[in-house]
Swiss-Prot record:
The gene is PROSER3. This is Proline and serine-rich protein 3. Residues 469-480 have a biased composition (Basic and acidic residues). Residues 38-50, 67-83, 134-147, 211-237, 255-279 have a biased composition (Low complexity). Its main location: cytoplasm. Residues 1-94, 111-166, 207-310, 336-392, 448-480 are annotated as: Disordered. Keywords: Coiled coil, Cytoplasm, Cytoskeleton, Phosphoprotein. The modification Phosphoserine is found at S408.
Length: 480
């Protein structure tokens, strides 16, 4: 093969028809043929590292393209061209950016220098997203059109697109900051209004609750009828109207309250507590009740009467128990009640409900006097109004405790002084119970004998109660 001939023939040359043929023509070196070249500048950048630096001077710079075409012939003379310079001889053709959006992004990817994401795509919302917040802002469509116009369509070199990108990014960041500030101010103002309205509503509710608490024991029904309309469901209503129903005056609304900010800043003074407005009555004072009950207990203990509440002092309790043991009637029910009054270490009986001072005085006056042991009056049941009989549950509980005490042999807790006293009282009560049962059986036998004897016709019939009373008086006289 002749070296003077080119490697590729005219038919196979991708560069079109070129005149061949002069002795001073140096053919180019062997080149690989690619069927389609999208961007000569991209292939040039991949082949030559210094290509971007050379492109910065311009595509028509004589430093890069050193081809010389003698005037005597139409063939080029390339005395010192390299393969990369031969490949980069045609001027870079840019894709028209007006064709499509993809072409614009391709041009920017090829020509522009690398930039950060913050400069290319600012974070956060754009001004067009909040166009209703700014009255002097232009139309969103014009903003988008202006943004599209700011993008350069053709970039012959990389210095100008970089400056344009930086400028457009700075212009985009400034409105973004303004929008953020306006948005923050708008949110803060809305938050302040909502907070103030909620605070005013809470103040109204607190005032209403305090008024209801203070007026529960001191206000009259006409005063207690004052009410306020509830606020709206969203809780953001800054106004409220209060209505006071009155029989002499018609229903008329008061002047509306001040708005929520003013109401929150200057709240109305809360009503005074109930203790300062209306003091408690003596009947409602627990200390007064306790003092009256203590005085009544002491008076009953000193007189030796049958007390329905045991004294609190141990000495008085022992004295009252000793007096009651001598003065109680010899009945089974009275023994059970006595066991109730005696405290037990295993269980504690429920205290009786305290009465008012008037009822306590009535009870003291109406209580029957103490009967002597063995008197006939002890057999008669007392009137139901004068005796506060305990409930059936208390009687059953007392019976259970008494049965448990009788079943015990006294060997448990022998060193306990309280149990020793209680056991001594239990032994005394058992002895008195046996004596009372014996006397009761004797009296009943005598009553049966007297009932079988018929009185004379002239004398009026005598009742068994009168006979038992006379027998009791005689027995008491014998005992004394």
């Amino acid at each position: 093969m002749d070296r003077s001939l080119p490697v590729f023939s005219i038919q196979d040359s991708p560069f079109g028809d070129a005149p061949l043929g002069r002795s001073h023509y140096w053919p180019s070196q062997s080149q690989t043929w690619c069927p389609k070249t999208l961007s000569p500048s991209r292939s040039q950048r991949s082949r030559l590292p210094q290509a971007p630096k050379a492109l910065a001077t311009g595509p028509n710079s004589p430093e890069l393209f050193e081809e010389s075409w003698p005037s005597s012939s139409g063939t080029p003379s390339l005395p010192s061209t390299t393969e990369g310079q031969m490949w980069a001889s045609p001027a870079p053709t840019l894709i028209d950016s007006g064709d499509s959006v993809v072409a614009k992004y391709i041009n920017r990817f090829r020509q522009a220098q690398p930039t950060s994401r913050e400069e290319r795509q600012p974070a956060g919302p754009t001004p067009a997203d909040f166009w209703w917040l700014q009255s002097d802002s232009p139309d969103p469509s014009s903003q988008s059109a202006a943004a599209g116009a700011n993008k350069p369509e053709g970039r012959p070199h990389t210095a100008v697109p970089t400056a344009v990108n930086v400028t457009s990014a700075s212009h985009a960041v400034a409105p973004l900051q303004e929008i953020k500030q306006n948005l923050h101010t708008w949110n803060s103002s809305l938050l302040d209004l909502e907070t103030l309205s909620l605070q005013s509503r809470a103040a109204r509710l607190l005032k209403r609750s305090k008024a209801s608490i203070s007026s529960s024991s001191s206000l009259s029904p006409s005063d207690a009828s004052t009410s306020s309309f509830p606020t709206s469901s969203d809780g953001l209503s800054p106004f409220s109207e209060t209505f006071i129903p009155d029989s002499s005056k018609g229903l008329g609304p008061r002047a509306p309250a001040s708005p929520a900010p003013a109401q929150a800043q200057t709240p109305t003074p809360a009503p005074a507590p109930a203790s300062s407005q209306a003091p408690l009555r003596p009947e409602d004072d627990i200390l007064y009740q306790w003092r009256q009950r203590r005085k009544l207990e002491q008076a009953q203990g000193s007189k030796g009467d049958r007390a329905w509440v045991p004294p609190l002092t141990p000495a008085l309790r022992t004295l009252a128990e000793s007096l009651k043991a001598k003065a109680l009637p010899p009945a089974a029910g009275s023994v059970i009640r006595k066991s109730e009054a005696t405290p037990s270490p295993g269980a504690c009986l429920q205290p009786e409900v305290p009465l008012s001072p008037a009822e306590q005085a009535t009870t003291v006056k109406a209580s029957p006097p103490a009967f002597q042991v063995g008197s006939p009056e002890a057999l008669a049941p007392p009137p139901p109004a004068a005796d506060h009989a305990p409930s059936e549950a208390l009687l059953a509980q007392a019976a259970l405790l008494l049965q448990a005490a009788e079943d015990s042999d006294g060997s448990e807790f022998q060193d306990d002084p309280v149990l020793q006293v209680l056991r001594a009282h239990r032994a005394e009560l058992s002895r008195q119970k046996r004596e009372a049962d014996a006397r009761l059986s004797f009296l009943l036998d005598q009553a049966e004998d007297l009932g079988s004897w018929s009185p004379p016709a002239g004398s009026p019939p005598r009742s068994p109660r009168r006979l038992l009373r006379r027998e009791g008086d005689s027995l008491e006289a014998r005992r004394l």
